[in-house]
Amino acid sequence: MEMVSKIACFVLLCMVVVAPHAEALTCGQVTAGLAPCLPYLQGRGPLGGCCGGVKGLLGSAKTTADRKTACTCLKSAANAIKGIDLNKAAGIPSVCKVNIPYKISPSTDCSTVQ
């Protein structure tokens, strides 16, 4: 019985050591996930797959660091991409029926995101 306990502990230790570490969210993932929103935000097309991308992003942003990264990336994109209707951007959470813990705006203070 003692040998079984030792083997079980060893197996558990191996599982902890080799368990994959969660990857941090990147700006590339944020922009790729929200790319379907661009035509809508620029007034060139329907909402389309935007809500799916938003929901996928919310599912990926599990930590405070991930949410801050997403906020910073969204803020940068809002400043860099010409022709974005900021009112439509701010309305995406409502339209997609999701809760984003900050306003999608170039003026958002991402350091306060939890």
Curated annotation (Swiss-Prot):
Source taxon at top rank: Eukaryota
BP term (GO), one: lipid transport
Signal peptide extent: 1-23
Pfam families (UniProt xref): Tryp_alpha_amyl (PF00234)
Protein's UniProt keywords contain Signal: yes
Gene Ontology MF terms in the entry: lipid binding
Disulfide links within the chain: 27-73, 37-50, 51-96, 71-110
Protein's job: Plant non-specific lipid-transfer proteins transfer phospholipids as well as galactolipids across membranes. May play a role in wax or cutin deposition in the cell walls of expanding epidermal cells and certain secretory tissues.
Family, as annotated: Belongs to the plant LTP family.
Protein name in UniProt: Non-specific lipid-transfer protein 1
Source organism of the structure: Solanum pennellii
Phylogenetic lineage: Eukaryota, Viridiplantae, Streptophyta, Embryophyta, Tracheophyta
